[in-house]
Structure formats: C-alpha cells, structure tokens
Amino acid sequence: MAAVTSAAVSIPSFTGLKAASASNAKVSASAKVSASPLPRLSIKASLKEVGAAVVATAASAMIASNAMAVDVLLGADDGSLAFVPSEFSVPAGEKIVFKNNAGFPHNVLFDEDAVPSGVDVSKISMSEEDLLNAKGETFEVALSDKGEYTFYCSPHQGAGMVGKVIVN
C-alpha cells in the first residue's frame, strides 16, 4: 500500500471567505436568445404529395389488373340462366371477361348473323364443344370492330341465355 505524507497533499482552507449579505448582493444577468428559422411543414403540400402517390398507385393497379375490362357473369346469383349484364357497351379493343358464376357448364358464342360485317366469329367465340364447367372459369375476348354483337351460351340459348355488346 502506498503512503501519502502531508507534504504531498495540501488541503485548501475556506476560513477567510466571508458570506455576502443579501442586501449587498447584486445579481445581473442577460441572455440573448436567437432562433434560427426552421422550415415549416406544409400540410397542404404533404396532402398533395400523398394524393399524387395514391393516384399513381391506383392507376398502376388498374393497368396491371382487369380493372380496364368488363366482367360478364355466366349465370346470375339467383341461379337463373342469364348473362349479367346481358347488354353493355365497351370501347373498341377493351377486354371482356366472361366468368362462370355457377356450376353449370357454359360457353360464349357470337352469332355470325348478328356481328359487324367482316368479323370472323370463329376467332372471337369459344368452340361449341368447349365449356366453362367450374365456377370461376373464364373466357376473355377483345372486340376491335365497332358495332353490335349478339352472343349466347349454346347449352342454354333455348332458355334465353343471350346477350348483346355494343362496341364504340
């Protein structure tokens, strides 16, 4: 263990200090506060940016999905044999998705006597032997020639399962 002698350590003495009385004490202080300008948040600008992001996201989702297509159900929710909707309009080239809504076998054929002249119905129709047997199965077509097209389901045409599309 190391020994420390009194000569090596000096302890200050505070005996000569006097306390100032409260009446004689003067305290003076000044402070200068300067604030640097901070950028203000703009809620309006933030909402514009968020809105633009939402619109851009929605637009890309619509382009990537069937949002630009018309969905036509084969069979109504109540079980009736019908196209839903049975009549509709689409712009030329827009995709039409026919979707089996029931467990019944359906198909989609375009009537060769009820399409614009020059349209080859074999290129836009399903084969008469092909059927959408299960619920959720689909057939897609895009019609490019303007005019009225009549279509039907061959197994249920006699029951009135007929529809019409107008291509603008």
Curated annotation (Swiss-Prot):
Membrane topology, as annotated, equals: Peripheral membrane protein
- Any coiled-coil ranges, and where? none
Q: Where does Cu cation bind?
A: H106, C153, H156, M161
Task: Name a single GO cellular component.
Answer: chloroplast thylakoid lumen
| Listed NCBIfam families | cyanin_plasto
Q: Does the record bear GTP-binding in its keywords?
A: no
Its chief place of residence is plastid
Tell me, in a sentence or two, what this protein's role is.
Participates in electron transfer between P700 and the cytochrome b6-f complex in photosystem I.
The upper taxonomy is: Eukaryota, Viridiplantae, Streptophyta, Embryophyta, Tracheophyta
Q: How is the cofactor bound?
A: The crystal structure with reduced Cu(1+) has also been determined.
Instruction: Describe the family membership recorded for this protein in Swiss-Prot or TrEMBL.
Output: Belongs to the plastocyanin family.
Designated name of the protein: Plastocyanin B, chloroplastic
Where does this one sit in the cell? Plastid, Chloroplast thylakoid membrane
Organism of this sequence: Populus nigra
Interval spanned by the transit peptide: 1-69
Q: Which cofactor does it need?
A: Cu(2+)
Keywords of the record, alphabetical order, are: Chloroplast, Copper, Electron transport, Membrane, Metal-binding, Plastid, Thylakoid, Transit peptide, Transport
Pfam families given in the database record: Copper-bind
Q: Which residues form the Plastocyanin-like domain?
A: 70-168
Q: What are the recorded GO MF terms, alphabetically? A: copper ion binding; electron transporter, transferring electrons from cytochrome b6/f complex of photosystem II activity
Superkingdom, according to UniProt?
A: Eukaryota
Q: Give the residue range of the signal peptide.
A: none
